[in-house]
Amino acid sequence: MALDQSLVGRSYPPTAPYEVGREKIREFAEAVGDANPAYTDAEAAKALGHPDVIAPPTFVFSITFKAAGQVIEDPQLGLDYSRVVHGDQKFSYARPVRAGDRLTVTSTIEAIKSMAGNDILDIRGEVHDEAGEHVVTAWTKLVARAAEEA
């Protein structure tokens, strides 16, 4: 079943604030094997001009993908998540994510395309801090593979 094209441009309500913790940043940096001291040492981050430790660039995927759940679970969209694979991910930063940030994400369906029987869904996640300042935009591309013929 094709995805509902009429939903292109639909935005979903902002998520509840997610508080970025130093420990979460450290765990993520270790998990991805990034030893940049700005991710684990507040003094190293301050020496680079940051008020506290900063997160690796892909850290926000964990909150933007969770926010994309509003899109994925929208029954009007018609997405069969059992057929979905992650196709692509991009980020555009206004500033680094920092420990202590309280971030919200607003997800928008940016595009729906069909190609070779597969549906391609592009979701844009706008991330803002509690002051309403833009921090990062994340684009997630999901591919709903065509159903296999019996």
From Swiss-Prot:
Pfam families: FAS1_DH_region. GO terms for biological process: fatty acid biosynthetic process. GO terms for molecular function: (3R)-hydroxyacyl-[acyl-carrier-protein] dehydratase activity. InterPro entries: FAS1-like_DH_region (IPR039569), HadA-like (IPR016709), HotDog_dom_sf (IPR029069), UPF0336/Enoyl-CoA_hydratase (IPR050965). Residues 8-116 form the MaoC-like domain. Belongs to the UPF0336 family. This is UPF0336 protein SCO4636.
